[in-house]
Amino acid sequence: MERDRITALKRSFEVEEIEPPNSTPPRRVQTPLLRATVASSSQKFQDLGVKNSEPAARLVDTLSQRSPKPSLRRVDLAGAKAPEPMSRRTELSIDISSKQVESTASTPGPSRFGLKRAEVLGHKTPEPVPRRTEITIVKPQESGLRRVETPASKAPEGSAMPVTDAAPKRVEIQVPKPAEAPNCPLPPQTLENSEAPMSQLQSRLEPRPPVTEVPYRNQEDSEVAPSCVVDMADNPRDAMLKQAPVSRNEKAPVDFGYVGIDSILEQMRRKAMKQGFEFNIMVVGQSGLGKSTLINTLFKSKISRKSVQPISEERIPKTIEIKSITHDIEEKGVRMKLTVIDTPGFGDHINNENCWQPIMKFINDQYEKYLQEEVNINRKKRIPDTRVHCCLYFIPATGHSLRPLDIEFMKRLSKVVNIVPVIAKADTLTLEERVYFKQRITSDLLSNGIDVYPQKEFDEAEDRLVNEKFREMIPFAVVGSDHEYQVNGKRILGRKTKWGTIEVENTTHCEFAYLRDLLIRTHMQNIKDITSNIHFEAYRVKRLNEGNSAMANGIEKEPETQEM
């Protein structure tokens, strides 16, 4: 019985032919046959020389008929390992190659049958390997891969594994795939209930698994032969390893739904910074109320008329004169063309009847000049804006109420320009006098129908609360000064007296800071918009109606500049 099994075992090994001398592998170690154990094995191996001319296809068919079990998939790790003790039942995987094996009985060393290493099941748990493993099925025609054979002895040789570079590599272990038999045919042989001594089988069945180390391949390379490559990194636990690192030079992906409408703000800012801004402010009041000083304090520059004009040329005018001076102011890259319009002689005469008419005429003349520039056929690309945007009206700090001149002037000019009333030299009033004086002025404005800026009818929804607070402060009790002092280590603008220093920008001393915020920091653009959209628009409609009626009657009529 035992002899028959040995005979069957030898028949299963009659699968490879002798390889021609020119195709002898460069590294071949042969194992001597155990003639003492098996008596008839020498005769069987001598018969192999006769079968050298048989084709490789016939050998594959012979083995496929004798294969009692399907092929087994196994995973071998790179590196030579000492053989482990095998059980009585051993499963073998035979790698069929089209090359012939040169085998002679007289040559010492084991015969090369191209057998896979026997996989011993249930003895040792494989250790985790930090490298990525790719299972690849070797085709018989692929001869370009490097084959590294382990030595037949149990002690591994030092030169068994080739030394490779330090680049990260993945180990490809060749296993057969039963589902793809036409592409990668690897029929296995199984020995069951073998009672032969293990020492006899090790000489014949010592595995020589072809292990190939290849450099790391990217995703495109792994898709070349999808029928014979199974990438273990496709598992969810290795999905993160396959992701390529993001380059540092790559920009963050732009939102797909982003259009770029918000860039219009930057475009408008660049255009406005290039063109600059224009602001025209008029100061009206009697002489000696500190009009020029307040303007210098507002813009912290010597921009008033008196600051530029020599004192020797200063004289008391017999009539009201309108004088303007223009400055180019730049702060943090923002340029503004500031025009200050002064009205010397207003209210300084004995008879102040109709003293407001020159001021009204000047305001309407600026509207007319701007209108003529608009209606021209070949008008300028940018029309110079000389319209009066704001008028500061200085009220003397009498402590009583408004004078008839003040009421008449503000009543007429509030319809054509933005009027902001201020109490000049408010430091001459006590706190109680200031509160009482402001209440009297507010009641006089309401009783005479004088609508000062900010007008309630022009309020926008988001500015209503802010404008209400400003309206409660009107008229602003201000103090102007262009002298600097050191108070508690800080530089301030103020007025120094025997009893202390009045700080101009201190809201507990005066309301100059609120006036500056209204005119410059919060409402400057709104003041210009109301001038253009409300006051100038009313003047333009009136002039166009007058022009149409004059053309209908055939009469040329001079534009009225006295009053709207």
From Swiss-Prot:
Expressed in the brain, mainly in the perikarya and processes of astrocytes in the cerebellum, dentate gyrus and corpus callosum (at protein level). In the sciatic nerve, highly expressed in Schwann cells (at protein level). Isoforms are differentially expressed in testes, kidney, liver, heart, spleen and brain. Undetectable in skeletal muscle. The keyword Chloroplast does not apply. One of its GO terms (biological process) is anterograde dendritic transport of neurotransmitter receptor complex. Residues 424-427 are annotated as: G4 motif. The modification N-acetylmethionine is found at M1. The modification N6-acetyllysine is found at K44. Residues 285-292 are annotated as: G1 motif. SUPFAM superfamilies: P-loop containing nucleoside triphosphate hydrolases. GTP binds at residues 285-292, 319, 345, 425-433, 480, 495. It comes from the Eukaryota. Residues 275-546 form the Septin-type G domain. It is found in: Cytoplasm, Cytoskeleton. Residues 38-165, 178-224 are annotated as: Disordered. Residues 95-109, 190-203 have a biased composition (Polar residues). The modification Phosphothreonine is found at T24, T31, T125. Residues 116-134 have a biased composition (Basic and acidic residues). InterPro entries: G_SEPTIN_dom, P-loop_NTPase, Septin. The modification Phosphoserine is found at S12, S64, S67, S71, S307, S312. The modification Phosphotyrosine is found at Y258. One of its GO terms (molecular function) is GTPase activity. Belongs to the TRAFAC class TrmE-Era-EngA-EngB-Septin-like GTPase superfamily. Septin GTPase family. Septins polymerize into heterooligomeric protein complexes that form filaments, and associate with cellular membranes, actin filaments, and microtubules. GTPase activity is required for filament formation. Interacts with SEPTIN2, SEPTIN6, SEPTIN7, SEPTIN11 and SEPTIN14. Interacts with RTKN and ARHGEF18. Filament-forming cytoskeletal GTPase. May play a role in cytokinesis (Potential). This is Septin-9. It comes from Rattus norvegicus (Rat). The lineage of its organism: Eukaryota, Metazoa, Chordata, Craniata, Vertebrata.
